[in-house]
Design a protein with these regions (language model features):
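Conserved hydrophobic positions within beta-strands
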Residues: 74, 159, 196-199, 232
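RNA pseudouridine synthases
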Residues: 1-169, 175-178, 275-279
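Pseudouridine synthases involved in rRNA/tRNA modification
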Residues: 1-29, 188-191, 201-206, 214, ...
């Protein structure tokens, strides 16, 4: 499938592709296979681009997941991105029964003949926003800015107890739990992990918190709040004993980033699920 890129400023075509943090080897292969065109004509990597030019890349891909017929809650879509409000109780990718399979079905119905790519992950019971990326260049771009913490990802969670401070930060490294598979722990030898939070509602037993991730470690929110004595409601793996929910209450509610093609800031919000209530 071919994807078009409207050029805004004069630039060498190779430098333009490198601006997406796309690897030199992949760029070389695009030109070697004659997949890059300018205004309808095949070009080489020495070509200069001008404002208003239409660069076209043929990615020669096909859908790589088995399609699964289910509804998608799509909150944003253009030629480069598909942002979805993920429901609970579904994993991101698997051979047959995952969000990627549902996206594959959507691609098939809409003649989007591209690999199914996601920029980040959400756990099975986490609801909310997840970015699928149609364009390989844009995936490379997002991966870079996720690593440099320039994509803003905000969450809502309900945790046990009342926190001591209305807002704060948890700056504790996270590593593997050697005794329990698929569990993380705070560890001096772990990777840097920083979680910022602010209480938005509370009662004597529970707190609803808004969370901003500075880093994106696996289970970061769940591990950090468990470590400070406030595990997420429903998160049995990390110590919740309340039995108030059959899933942990964590929702990816806002994502914002600069669009690599238009340079506009994209900001998307997903409504908080109905089961996110703490009462009086």
């Amino acid at each position: 499938m071919k994807i078009n890129y409207k050029i805004k400023n004069s630039i060498n075509v190779r430098d333009y592709l490198l601006s997406f943090y796309y690897s030199s080897s992949k760029i070389y292969k695009l030109f070697l296979d004659k997949k890059v065109s300018l205004n309808g004509e095949i070009i080489n990597e020495r070509k200069e681009l001008n404002s208003g030019d239409i660069l076209e890349i043929d990615y020669d891909e096909e859908i790589d997941y088995k399609p699964l017929e289910k509804d998608l809650d799509i909150l944003y879509e253009d030629d480069y991105f598909l942002i979805i409000n993920k429901p609970k109780n579904i994993i991101i990718h698997d051979e047959n029964n995952s969000l990627c399979n549902i996206v594959a079905n959507y691609y098939k119905k809409n003649n989007i003949n591209l690999n199914v790519r996601f920029a980040h992950r959400l756990d099975k019971d986490t609801t909310g926003l997840i970015i699928f990326v149609k364009c390989p260049l844009c995936l490379s771009y997002l991966n870079h800015f996720i690593e440099t913490h320039e994509i803003r990802r905000e969450y809502i969670a309900i945790v046990n107890g009342k926190l001591n401070n209305k807002k704060g930060s948890i700056d504790l490294p996270i590593g593997e739990d050697r005794h329990i598979s698929n569990k993380k722990i705070v560890s001096k030898t772990g990777k840097k992990a920083v979680t910022h939070y602010e209480i938005i509602e509370e009662n004597n037993k529970y707190s609803m918190v808004k969370i901003l991730l500075e880093t994106g470690r696996t289970h970061q929110i769940r591990c950090h709040f468990s470590h400070i004595g406030h595990p997420l409601i429903g998160d049995v793996l990390y110590g919740d004993k309340s039995k108030l929910s059959n899933r942990y209450l964590l929702h990816s509610y806002k994502i914002s980033f600069v669009h690599p093609i238009t340079n506009e800031r994209i900001e998307i919000e997903a409504k908080i699920p109905l089961d996110f209530k703490i009462g009086k």
